[in-house]
Amino acid sequence: KNASPDDLKKAYRKAAIKNHPDKGGDPEKFKELAQAYDVLSDPEKREIYDQYGEDALKEGMGGGGGDHDPFDIFQSFFGGGGFGGGGSSRGRRQRRGEDVVHPLKVSLEELYNGTSKKLSLSRNVICSKCNGKGSKSGASMRCASCQGSGMKVSIRQLGPGMIQQMQHPCNDCKGTGEMINDKDRCPLCKGEKVVQEKKVLEVHVEKGMQNGQRITFPGEADEAPDTVTGDIVFVLQQKEHPKFQRKGDDLFYKHTLSLTEALCGFQFVLTHLDGRQLLIKSNPGEVVKPDQFKAINDEGMPMYQRPFMRGKLYIQFLVDFPDSLTPDQCKVIESVLPRSASSQLTDMEIDECEETTMHDVNIEEEMRRKQHQHAQEAYDEDDEGHGGGQRVQCAQQ
């Protein structure tokens, strides 16, 4: 408890050299030494340890060393060269920067044919004037407030034997762990170590790519000192098409026929996603039923990275029936089409039946109306039940 900072440094240096994994030492012992030094060399963490014990440091913020690389602490004493100038077998680990994700809207035509899009983006890059040091001299001071960790720990007493620990970036150094003298700040980046630049990226959307597919530009995200630069990622978002619908490598297309076309034959021109004109026609004597599907091989979407292979094009046929027919039209149709057995009823069978009257109905609206009616009735019944109870209570008073 009474050891001075210099005593701690000497003791750590001696034990760390002895137990370093590159010298055949025990990795776990080396890690424990780093954790102990990290706590004892930080006045704030040491106070927490003295008052509440090791568990208080581990709980919630990993202050017992879990957030600090033992090799980083070792290299703060000996530099990055390791032993004998040969370099450490492990080296200093760099934090990886965050990826930047952008949605990219594309049409179905662009996914079918492939396309390229040039996009202008702003990003942070290491300041070229100070090489990311933030100062003219290249020097910086360790933040006294957070002891260079970039983080502060606050403790709040919740009750007897209960504490809450919170870790937050240091306000003095903005989480960097370093302080730069105002007079020594880099004139270009103002001590921020990075500057903004405009970058134009050309995004290649290949044939057959899917909705939600990611296109990655490695190492093109924001740069930061001692950080492995993250990626810029574009996520494809397919816009809705007025005529075609895509399912995997297949395309679906709806076409409405008149009743005459459905019974007597049809032909029409379908404009595909690449502008080609496809002639679609029925076979002689073929009758198309409502909601019937037909398939055309190799006219679906190109398969990703196999552009000469395609899925299927499915055409769903809808049949538009006339609203009514004249008696003469009915006679003509009956003379051509076979009558169904159910329509050939005798007069005696008809006399024994009750006549009914049918009317047009929008079934979706009808079901919504009934659902609303049932909900209203249930609400009214519940309201009456509560009301009755209140009236009885008033009578007792």
Swiss-Prot record:
Residue numbers with lipid attached (S-farnesyl cysteine): C394
Membrane topology: Lipid-anchor
Region of interest: Disordered: 367-397
Propiece residues: 395-397
Disulfide bonds listed in the record: none
Location of the J domain: 1-52
Keywords from the UniProt entry: Chaperone, Lipoprotein, Membrane, Metal-binding, Methylation, Prenylation, Repeat, Zinc, Zinc-finger
GO biological process: protein folding
PROSITE patterns per the UniProt record, alphabetical: DNAJ_1, DNAJ_2, ZF_CR
ZnF (CR-type) intervals: 114-198
Keyword Nucleotide-binding: no
Residues in CXXCXGXG motif repeats: 127-134, 143-150, 170-177, 186-193
InterPro entries given in the database record: DnaJ_C, DnaJ_domain, DnaJ_domain_CS, DNJA1/2-like, HSP40/DnaJ_pept-bd, HSP_DnaJ_Cys-rich_dom, HSP_DnaJ_Cys-rich_dom_sf, J_dom_sf
Pfam families: DnaJ, DnaJ_C, DnaJ_CXXCXGXG
GO MF annotation, one: Hsp70 protein binding
Cell compartments where the protein resides: Membrane
Residue numbers carrying Cysteine methyl ester: C394
GO terms under cellular component: endoplasmic reticulum; membrane
Principal location class: membrane
UniProt key word Chaperone: yes
Function: Plays a continuous role in plant development probably in the structural organization of compartments.
Protein name (record): DnaJ protein homolog 1
Native source species: Allium porrum
